[in-house]
């Protein structure tokens, strides 16, 4: 019986939304696919974290821009056969938490 291997990155930032990232969502999706990963979870820094999205934007526009890295990774993942999931990294009183299982709404 052959064993199937699944490899997921559970904490990944994109330059569309996280100030610390150096690559776009699409670039990251390609890099992880080439490295043999099954999927990734995009967890860009949220509002009170190290975000690159202008905090003075109206909320709806802020959320739209925050989601761009995920959307670009998701589109590229669909094209190349990589699973891509949505999450974010929230900061509260200096502690960071990864949030999974919610959607963009």
Residue ranges and their predicted role:
Residues 2-105:
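A metal-dependent hydrolase metal-coordination microenvironment
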């Amino acid at each position: 019986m052959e064993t199937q291997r699944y490899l997921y990155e559970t904490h990944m930032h994109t330059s569309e939304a996280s100030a610390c990232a150096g690559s776009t969502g699409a670039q990251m999706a390609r890099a992880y696919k080439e490295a043999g990963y099954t999927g990734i979870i995009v967890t860009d820094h949220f509002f009170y974290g190290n975000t690159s999205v202008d905090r003075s934007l109206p909320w709806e526009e802020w959320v739209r821009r925050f989601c761009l890295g995920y959307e670009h990774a998701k589109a590229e993942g669909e094209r190349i056969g990589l699973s891509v999931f949505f999450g974010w990294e929230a900061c509260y009183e200096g502690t960071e938490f990864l949030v999974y299982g919610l959607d963009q709404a």
